[in-house]
Amino acid sequence: SFVALVFTTSAFAKEVTLLMDWFPQGNQSGYWQAEFDNQYHDDVTIKVKSGGPKVNTTQMVASGQVEFGLQASDSVMMANAKGAGLKGIFVSLNHVPYTLVYHPNTGVKSVKDLDGRPFAVKMGVTYWKWVKQKYQLNAVKEFPLTGDLGLFARTPQQFQQGYSLFLPARLAAKGVATEQITIEELGYRPYSVLFTTDKMIKENPELVQTVVDRLSISFPKSLIDPKPTRDFILSKSKKVNAEIHNNALELMKRDFLPKDWSKIGCQDPNRWVELANQMK
């Protein structure tokens, strides 16, 4: 009946916001695709919001300003240690593509050879605390990452944090040769995970499940036909061109996503245990 129809749409037609971990970039393609696909769904309207260096994603979700956020699983655990009450619901990368990029032919044979050098880093980032402790890098001269690739290009001894999906390719496009040590190969591998609050899961389980279901559709779609999300992301980013973006998607498919795309989003509880032990 008409009354029943009104009831069902009002019960489920809801708008939710997914706050990203950074400005629009290729590893977020499946999330942006979900927003583009709102026209095909009448269950939930998904709005995706850009992050950035001044955006505290875990805080925004924990305080209820947005419903969902994308962040590294170690950041989620750090927030939970302060009582945030957050839970990962959808893994979009098997590990965050943190990498340490350095100049070739500067005497680096292992991560220990980076000790004593200047390092452009996002101050306070959790993986670096672990790397420093694990590999005894006590003399590194840390300074805040600004995104100025020119400084790196001019400073042979410097190394820099970035995403392996983008930073080496961006530097190569500027004619700067690099080598890298990924944080994953050093043994630290937090998920890149969409999360929400325990409260949201308890009070709106159908809504949370609907968002997960929508993402399970949008992620493979964004890989099969990457043009819509690529055009959008390139329109928002001056730092990445089509070649760098396409290369990032190929790296994602090779190293960061399950070979069976129907398993994108799935998580292994043991990985959270592994990470918790590393963060002690």
Regions picked out by a protein language model, each given a short descriptive name:
Residues 24, 166-167, 185-187, 236-237:
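Glycine-rich beta-alpha junction loops
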Residues 14-145, 149-162, 181:
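Short, glycine-/small- and polar/acidic-enriched structural segments
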Residues 33-35, 98-108, 191-207, 260:
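A bilobed periplasmic-binding-protein/Venus flytrap-type ligand-binding module shared by bacterial periplasmic
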